[in-house]
Amino acid sequence: MDRAELGAALRDYAYLEGDFVLRSGRRSRYYLDKYRFETVPELLGPLGELIAETVSEHEPDAVRLAGPELGAVALAAAASLSSGLPFLLVRKEAKEYGTANRLEGVFQTGERVCLVEDVVTSAGAAIEAVEALREAGLEVGTAVCVVDREEGGADALARAGVRLRALFRPTELLELSKSAAKPHG
């Protein structure tokens, strides 16, 4: 599946129109349902390959990937399988049992990590993940997301010293597919 076919399939599977409240609290007339594309092997595999290629091109010094729970874990795993780079799971908060870790996986202080994200709007969750990785002594300079909604997330990440590399943007997804968006509900 080439990039254009992947974008068209992504839109066909995950682009919904309606009235939605986003994680950021903003309202939107469209929604990209990440679980509709992260749970379909025909999309998850090619997305993992494209994320791996993007990491190789834009963050070649990365020795590890990191995916925030819950949404980006499947993407980080797919990119890990494609790239051969191990990955970390970034919890929203440290668990209160077992090892009490916020980061799951093995790593060494000072390693360069590339953050993998699903859909970026304001980048609030991505910045929280970057902060957790940095607090653990890891270096983060790049984040790769499937879709940048172009609503300030790239600028917010830049202020945190992280470059955002998006595989797709909403306007591009709309141009790649001729089929009608699925109504929500």
Spell out what each predicted region is.
Residues 1-116, 120-185:
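PRPP-associated nucleotide enzymes
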